[in-house]
Structures are given as structure tokens and as C-alpha cells.
């Protein structure tokens, strides 16, 4: 919804799709989401009819939880036209297939007109029109140009790249890293310890990008360092906040209630990236440790020990 504000401010006609009739009725009635403080303009169409929303649309922005991208893109394929462009704003890895979202959509829709948009931005900052930057990854010049034309303005900067896999790795794994960074905060460690952890994580992410065929320079992009720094240092990040609750030693009930009432993409991605690393025989000890803390209930204090002993 925050991204919709950019397109709207750039004089684009906006249609929003949801699969929930209740959500549609609530948004139409209140013209506001309970998730972010954004007054939805009255001329933005809100519908549960995907055909209606996709018809005569130039750019289709995919901004839904990663686990629904597969089923949603299969439905989208019924109405997609070859001259349309898909802009992926969702982040994550599908658990069963271990595929990134670009590949999932490519498998379901026969088009190269797909871009991945990613960067260090929070929804409220987008809505408040402060200067922000995005990386836009696509192999299609047409796709990059049409999305940039619709999004760039005097407060939104777009940098182009062809490194789709590197952009998706950064956007996905940063949510997992943010959980661990929040744990350090929850245990009472200062920002100095967090920056040590973030720096070590950047080295590991860069190595993963290279191992999966991406461009290691992507780590220095808006989608890389920019998004990782933001997500790993702010309580506005849901993933960071979850980690902080764990680090503070909150009860299982309190933690589970937070998870139940909040979208935590880092948890979903943690299981996916763990499986991906195993399948590809790639070593990334920091992911194994975060997994052990969250799933196998190891003490969060193992994080600092790991950082000191890490080669």
C-alpha cells in the first residue's frame, strides 16, 4: 500500500487487489489500513476481482507475503498480457521448492517483463515522501524503464541492475539477519556489537550471492547494505522486534502472540534458506545458529560467542 502512494503521487491510476472480501469492504469503508497510516484516495479502486484489477494495467506490483506468490501468480497468468510488466516488491524464498520469487513467477507466467524492486525503506517514510532509494533489478530494459518512469520523482531514486538473484538474496536474508540483530539488542548489547554482527553478516551474504551466481557488488546497493542496515537497527522492523523479544527472554506465549498477530517474513525465510543451503551444499554458519536459537531453543547468548570465534 505504501508503494501505491508513490505511483499515485506520480499521477498513475491505481487499482488494488486483495483476496479477502472482509479486507476489501473494510478498506472501501474506512479508506485506511489498520497496518499503516495511509489515507487511501477515493479514486483508487479496491477489488477482489483479479481480472478487473489486471485489465488495462501497465504495471502489476506484487506485494504479498512470499508464501502466496506461487498461487497468486498462477491465477494472474490467466489474465496477464504480454505487454504488461510485473514488479516484485515481495521478499523471500518459497519453502517447498527453495525458489526465489522471480523464478516462481517466471515458472508460472511466460514473460521476461519482470523486475524486482528492493531498498532500505519503511512504509511510513514512503508515505511521508522523504528521500528514499530503490534498486530495480531486471534483465529487460523495457521493464526497468517503464517501472522507473512510473516511480522515480523528486523524492524517489531508482538505481538499475541486472543482478536479480543478488537483489533477491539481499532482500530475503536481511529479514533473518534482522531477527538476530534484534536478539543482541534484547540482550542489552550496544550498537557497537550490532555493527560487528552486521559487518560479519555482510561478508557471508556477499559470499552467498557469489555462490548462487550473482554479482557480489550488489551487497553495496540500496537493496544490499541500505536495506540490511535499516532492517537490522530499527524497532520499526517486525523481524528486529521479534529478535528483541527473544533476546529479552520473553515468554513463549508472548513471542507466539507477536508472531501470530504480525507478518514475520524472516521466520518463513529462515526455514527456506536453511533448506536451500543444505540442498546447494553451501556453508553459512550464522544461519545455522539463528535456526538453532529459534527452532532448537539454544540460548541467544551463543550469538556473541559465535562472533568472537568466527574466522
Where are these regions (language model features)?
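Catalytic phosphate-donor-binding core of small-molecule kinases
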Residues: 128-133, 138-153, 158, 194, ...
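Rossmann-like NAD(P)(H) cofactor-binding subdomain of soluble oxidoreductases
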Residues: 40, 47-55, 59-129, 147
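Electropositive phosphate-/nucleotide-binding environments in soluble metabolic enzymes
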Residues: 1, 21, 47, 63-66, ...
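Rossmann-fold dinucleotide-binding core
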Residues: 93-191
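Active-site-proximal catalytic alpha-helix in oxidoreductases
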Residues: 130-136, 165-210, 221-241
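NAD(P)+-binding Rossmann beta1-loop-alpha1 motif at the extreme N-terminus of oxidoreductases
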Residues: 1-39, 43-48, 75
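NAD(P)-dependent Rossmann-like dehydrogenase/reductase catalytic/cofactor-binding core
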Residues: 181-182, 210-220, 224-311
Amino acid at each position: 500500500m505504501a508503494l501505491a502512494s508513490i505511483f499515485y503521487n506520480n499521477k498513475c491510476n491505481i487499482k488494488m487487489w486483495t483476496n479477502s472480501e472482509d479486507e476489501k469492504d473494510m478498506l472501501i469503508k474506512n479508506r485506511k489500513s489498520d497496518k499503516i497510516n495511509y489515507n487511501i484516495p477515493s479514486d483508487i479502486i479496491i477489488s477482489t476481482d483479479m481480472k478487473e484489477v489486471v485489465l488495462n494495467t501497465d504495471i502489476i506490483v506484487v506485494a504479498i507475503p512470499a508464501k502466496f506468490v506461487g498461487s497468486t501468480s498462477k491465477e494472474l497468468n490467466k489474465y496477464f498480457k504480454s505487454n504488461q510488466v510485473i514488479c516484485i516488491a515481495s521478499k523471500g524464498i518459497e519453502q517447498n521448492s527453495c525458489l526465489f520469487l522471480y523464478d516462481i513467477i517466471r515458472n508460472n507466467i511466460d514473460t521476461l517483463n519482470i523486475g524486482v524492486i528492493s531498498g532500505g525503506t519503511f512504509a511510513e517514510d514512503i508515505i511521508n515522501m522523504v528521500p528514499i532509494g530503490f534498486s530495480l533489478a531486471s534483465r529487460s530494459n523495457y521493464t526497468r524503464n517503464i517501472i522507473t518512469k512510473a516511480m522515480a520523482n523528486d523524492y524517489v531514486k531508482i538505481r538499475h541492475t541486472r543482478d536479480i538473484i543478488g537483489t533477491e538474496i539481499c532482500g530475503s536474508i536481511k529479514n533473518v539477519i534482522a531477527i538476530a540483530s534484534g536478539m543482541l539488542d534484547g540482550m542489552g548489547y550496544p550498537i557497537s556489537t550490532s555493527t560487528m554482527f552486521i559487518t560479519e553478516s555482510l561478508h557471508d551474504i556477499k559470499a552467498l550471492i557469489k555462490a548462487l551466481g550473482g554479482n557480489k557488488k550488489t551487497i553495496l546497493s540500496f537493496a544490499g547494505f541500505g536495506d540490511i542496515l535499516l532492517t537490522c537497527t530499527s524497532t520499526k522492523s517486525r523481524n528486529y522486534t521479534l529478535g528483541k523479544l527473544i533476546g529479552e527472554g520473553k515468554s513463549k506465549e508472548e513471542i507466539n502472540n507477536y508472531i501470530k498477530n504480525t507478518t514475520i517474513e524472516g521466520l518463513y525465510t529462515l526455514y527456506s534458506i536453511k533448506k536451500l543451503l543444505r540442498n546447494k551444499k553451501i556453508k553459512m554458519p550464522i544461519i545455522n545458529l539463528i535456526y538453532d536459537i529459534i527452532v532448537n531453543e539454544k540460548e541467544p547468548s551463543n550469538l556473541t560467542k559465535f562472533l568472537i570465534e568466527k574466522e
